[in-house]
Amino acid sequence: MPEQVTDQENQAPQQQTTAVHAYNPEVLQDMLPVYYRRLFPHLPFYRWLSYGSSEDAIFSNREISFTLQDDIYIRYLCFDTQAELEKEICSRNPIKIDIGPVMHSKPKNHRSIPGGLTPVQRELVFDIDMTDYDEVRTCCSGAGVCLKCWKFMVLAARVLDVALREDFGFEHIIWIFSGRRGIHCWVCDYQARHLDGRGRYAVAEYLNIITYASFAGGNSPRCSMGDRPHHSLKRALKIVEPMFEEIVLEDQNLFGTPKGVTKLLNMVHDDAARGELESYMQKNLEDGAHSRLVWESFIKYANSMRTSTTSAWSRKLKNIVAEIQLGLLYPRLDINVTRGFNHLLKAPFCIHPATGKVCVPFSVSAVAKFDPTTVPTITQLLHEINAFDDKSKSYMEAPEDKSRIKDHKKTSMFKGVVVFEEFLRKLERSQKSASLQF
């Protein structure tokens, strides 16, 4: 079952959205020192990547990369302690931090290692980008995202999370908002981290069910369920089907134009059947009919044709309705990210330079309540700290008092840290339990 997180994550502080606190990319470099010094969760970040020091050199051999101002990219960084990493972050104030694999030797010595570095472990990661849904969303495109198209990410997280837990037995999964238009999934179980290249390829291929057929107007998503649909496809269908009408027919009105009707027709993977369906729709639908009417007409025709034992609709198209629903709503994975051992992925709690938003963790059990349009920006966070301190004067009165409230608790970033720390507690409990068995 999806991971449960305390109710605190849903108790977002009041957010300031006035133009006065709008994010300006030109002053990001001026704000990052304050963010890294006062808000970035250095200790939880270290606790995650060190995994309780359960394995030799698991932290010190981890490759970290920084992207600095003016696109200066520094790879092969590594650190022996949490203090070293924190000092370097606060000194360089990177615009982005990327996390790579744990190597067989310290990455900083890569030039002197015969044969180069060899990765020995790495979290199993998934990257889902909203731009891969541009062909099936009409509300936004490119870097744009709104609450309507965020529902594609809601379904992606739900489908993928339950598959990873039920089909592979993974437990320690953290979901991260990418800061702009996508989501990242980190699977941190020991077995996942130690998968070899073939194992990662197998997992990626198992979960990547969408294929594409080329037509004059572009690529058409396809999902073949076969004569005996796999249980994972049946489970995914149970998740996406209840939201199909809301997302595809209402929010996106995907079939509400001639181009949209063509998208639907192109998903019928039989030339003769497609031609028959097109003729039927031309006779029974007006141009520009709402998607709901188009879909109802399609369902009516498909059901009537299934009664013919000689028709493709009763054989290879018998699951066409479910295949279209999955083809439009199933997670669209960048499988090269998952298959690759050396891929570096953006770290949680980075600031996206284009939007200024924090790459915050979220709970999959509350993903439908997650609003990407109100994720706090660095500008907003610094204002929230100042507003809190001006009100309480606690920061000025007790700068060295260890009992004073932590800065992230003064801001709307707090709920993301709560999600992350709850994930860490479960991960660390599991590691302690495993160590007691030896």
Swiss-Prot record:
Pfam families reported for this sequence: DNA_primase_S
Enzyme class: transferase
Statement: the UniProt record of this protein carries the keyword Cell inner membrane: no
Tissue: Expressed in embryos (at protein level).
Catalytic residues identified in the record: 63, 127, 129
UniProt activity-regulation remark: The presence of the regulatory subunit Prim2 accelerates the kinetics of initiation and primer extension.
GO CC annotation terms, alphabetical: alpha DNA polymerase:primase complex
Keyword Zinc listed: yes
Listed GO MF terms: DNA-directed RNA polymerase activity; metal ion binding
Enzyme Commission code(s) on record: 2.7.7.-
Coiled-coil annotated residue ranges, if any: none
Range of residues in the leader sequence: none
Any Gene Ontology biological process: DNA replication initiation
Entry-linked InterPro entries: DNA_primase_S (IPR002755), DNA_primase_ssu_euk/arc (IPR014052)
CDD domains attached to this UniProt entry: AE_Prim_S
Cofactor(s) required for function per UniProt: Mg(2+); Mn(2+)
Motif (Zinc knuckle motif): 139-149
Sorted UniProt keywords: DNA replication, DNA-directed RNA polymerase, Metal-binding, Nucleotidyltransferase, Primosome, Transcription, Transferase, Zinc
Anything else known: The bound zinc ion is not a cofactor. It is bound to a zinc knuckle motif that may be involved in sequence recognition and the binding of ssDNA.
Family of this protein: Belongs to the eukaryotic-type primase small subunit family.
Reported function: Catalytic subunit of the DNA primase complex and component of the DNA polymerase alpha complex (also known as the alpha DNA polymerase-primase complex) which play an essential role in the initiation of DNA synthesis. During the S phase of the cell cycle, the DNA polymerase alpha complex (composed of a catalytic subunit PolA1, an accessory subunit PolA2 and two primase subunits, the catalytic subunit Prim1 and the regulatory subunit Prim2) is recruited to DNA at the replicative forks.
Subunit structure: Heterodimer of a catalytic subunit Prim1 and a regulatory subunit Prim2, also known as the DNA primase complex. Component of the alpha DNA polymerase complex (also known as the alpha DNA polymerase-primase complex) consisting of four subunits: the catalytic subunit PolA1, the regulatory subunit PolA2, and the primase complex subunits Prim1 and Prim2 respectively. PolA1 associates with the DNA primase complex before association with PolA2.
PANTHER family attached to this UniProt entry: DNA PRIMASE SMALL SUBUNIT
Protein name in UniProt: DNA primase small subunit
Organism: Drosophila melanogaster (Fruit fly)
